[in-house]
């Protein structure tokens, strides 16, 4: 359950350097969570390298899972989803 109805919708942050979650991206979403939103969503991501539209865009692949887990755990630590 969300703690409230405030949701930060996905927007292109341009913080996925090397197409992987960066510390800057984690810090940004952590700050949003700390600010009280119920849920924050990370920007759109490519599911294949050929789907990348921009530098700084997430590319979903196995090796970025630890970075996404770090971001998720940090957001959850402040009560957001």
Q: Where on the chain are the PLM-derived regions?
A:
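Flavin-dependent oxidoreductase catalytic cores
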Residues: 1-81
